[in-house]
């Protein structure tokens, strides 16, 4: 059945860490427009590019940037089951980026803290060709300066820490 652009898509609740949780209603049309716009204007992803949002699909970033945004923007999305370490090792993210020629990765800082802890020298990183990889985006929680610097030094690419609606 057709929907109006202002029909609710879902309600997103803040964590409540600074008070009672607050519900944010996302409308269908506005959310789709914002997601499509952000793929080009924030993430520099073009139709046909390969994008990876390494998030839980149940979180807002997960369903928004694993499913909806890539679908509406016409790019390839990576759906990954596993953790950044231990599935099978701390090179899992590098293997996926290399194997699928990922242009940009969006993940939580915790993922990179885990990789850094397991492989501080970046030995797994050196095993893979990441020549197509351009930029790392971190969000969802505080990105500590040590983790950002470690990722920048390892990747030799920009590492962007940014915030979203319920984090501000």
Q: What is the role of each PLM region?
A:
Residues 14, 25:
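Short functional hotspots where side chains directly engage DNA or cofactors
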Residues 56:
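Residue(s) in the substrate-gating loop at a strand-loop-helix junction
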Residues 1-13, 20, 35, 44-50, ...:
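Conserved pre-ATP/AMP-binding loop-to-beta segment of ANL
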Residues 31-32:
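Adenylate-forming
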Residues 62-78:
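Conserved short alpha-helical elements in the N-terminal third of ANL/AMP-binding
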Residues 47-48, 82-168:
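Conserved adenylate-forming
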């Amino acid at each position: 059945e057709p929907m109006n652009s202002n029909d609710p898509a879902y309600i997103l609740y803040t964590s409540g860490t600074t008070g009672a949780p607050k519900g944010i209603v996302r409308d269908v049309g506005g959310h789709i427009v914002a997601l499509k716009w952000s793929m080009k204007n924030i993430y520099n992803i073009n139709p046909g590019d390969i994008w990876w949002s390494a998030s839980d699909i149940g979180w807002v970033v997960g369903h928004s940037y694993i499913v909806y945004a890539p679908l509406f923007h016409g790019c390839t999305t990576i759906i990954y089951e596993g953790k950044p370490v231990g599935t099978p090792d701390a090179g899992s993210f590098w293997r996926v980026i290399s194997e699928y020629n990922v242009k940009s990765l969006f993940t939580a800082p915790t993922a990179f803290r885990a990789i850094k802890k397991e492989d501080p020298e970046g030995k797994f990183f050196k095993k893979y060709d990441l020549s197509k990889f351009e930029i790392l985006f971190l969000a969802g929680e505080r990105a500590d300066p040590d983790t950002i610097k470690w990722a920048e030094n390892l990747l030799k690419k920009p590492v962007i820490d940014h915030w979203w609606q319920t984090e501000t």
